[in-house]
Amino acid sequence: MISAAQLLDELMGRDRNLAPDEKRSNVRWDHESVCKYYLCGFCPAELFTNTRSDLGPCEKIHDENLRKQYEKSSRFMKVGYERDFLRYLQSLLAEVERRIRRGHARLALSQNQQSSGAAGPTGKNEEKIQVLTDKIDVLLQQIEELGSEGKVEEAQGMMKLVEQLKEERELLRSTTSTIESFAAQEKQMEVCEVCGAFLIVGDAQSRVDDHLMGKQHMGYAKIKATVEELKEKLRKRTEEPDRDERLKKEKQEREEREKEREREREERERKRRREEEEREKERARDRERRKRSRSRSRHSSRTSDRRCSRSRDHKRSRSRDRRRSRSRDRRRSRSHDRSERKHRSRSRDRRRSKSRDRKSYKHRSKSRDREQDRKSKEKEKKGSDDKKSSVKSSSREKQSEDTNPESKESDTKNEVNGTSEDIKSEGDTQSN
């Protein structure tokens, strides 16, 4: 009844007898009523039903859904069910191994008994047969002697005795052959190395196939394969923590190396920043020094420019006054000369006036060119003063001061040239 109920539970579920409105029982895979061997793969009690190795019915729950839940859970192969299952299967294999050893021992013992038992009776029968043969030969000789002597009745009695001895000898020979045939049949047995059952050597193939496809043989074969598979899984499972620990250590070492490299990188970056800040400060100081030197040079150049411009303006005003006075004098002299020289021809006056105009134009153009050259030189000197350092500013001032006398000389020369030209022009007019 229990096995039938379990079969119905597997087919229809444990709540098969509940009404639709009744509450169903929700059993977890870790409940005590659940077969842990079934969760790990199969229940060994289901393998050997109605066989010599029957383990009896399993009273716990066998549910495929619970096994799937266990396989999907985070505690899969971590609770210890697989190790218990492996120990139970190994105990079953140890039992069948003992059975196989006992079978081999029985075969060896029976073979020894057969060999010793067959040798003993056979030897005794041979001896009896040999004794009977000797007696028969002796009796036959006696019968011949009695027949030659004419003792027929005695010879016939001995002949009957010889017949009895021959029958006894044949009986002994037949028993010996029977024992040998039985011994030969006993030697053809062997033990199955999987389930421990006795097999006949050279038996029909159908009977061999029936044995290989039987529950007992297939059950123990499945147990052996499952044991090897579980050993491999558990070995890998035990190696995984070691590997995880090793990988964790390697990861920690890598992180430490990365942190060390990061610290070194940050140290180099800080050092580089400090050096950059120092260089920037040095550049700022250099710029400040250059600005100061430029300001000093600009101040000195401006003062020198002011002095030069003042001297130039003074000279220009003086030269302008001189030119104005000369021009007035010339106009006066010309008007006087015109009044005095009315008799001269107008053409000659025109030519002379043209020559004077040309000379005055040339003089003005030369003075204009000299003024432009002087301005360009001053601009070049200002640019060079801005580029040079403050140390050379004093030398530039000296050079600018040295150049002032030259300009004065040039101005004086121009003035002298102008006066000389004016004098020449007046002389020409007077000579005319």
Swiss-Prot record:
Composition bias (Basic residues) maps to 288-301, 312-367
Q: Which UniProt keywords apply?
A: Acetylation, Coiled coil, DNA-binding, Isopeptide bond, mRNA processing, mRNA splicing, Nucleus, Phosphoprotein, Ubl conjugation
Q: What does the record give under GO molecular function?
A: DNA binding; mRNA binding
**Where does the source fall among the domains of life?**
Eukaryota
Q: Where in the cell is it found?
A: Nucleus speckle
Q: Which residues carry this modification: Phosphoserine?
A: S3, S110, S115, S420, S425, S431
Q: What residues bear N-acetylmethionine in this entry?
A: M1
In the record, biological process GO terms are:
mRNA splice site recognition; RNA splicing
Bias (Basic and acidic residues) occurs at 234-287, 302-311, 368-414, 421-432
Q: Which residues form a coiled coil?
A: 124-181
- Residue numbers bearing the N6-acetyllysine modification: K231
Its biological purpose? Binds cAMP regulatory element DNA sequence. May play a role in RNA splicing.
**Assigned protein family:** Belongs to the Luc7 family.
Which PANTHER family does this UniProt record tie to the protein?
Answer: RNA-BINDING PROTEIN LUC7-RELATED
| UniProt name for this protein | Luc7-like protein 3
Q: Which organism is it from?
A: Mus musculus (Mouse)
The organism's lineage? Eukaryota, Metazoa, Chordata, Craniata, Vertebrata
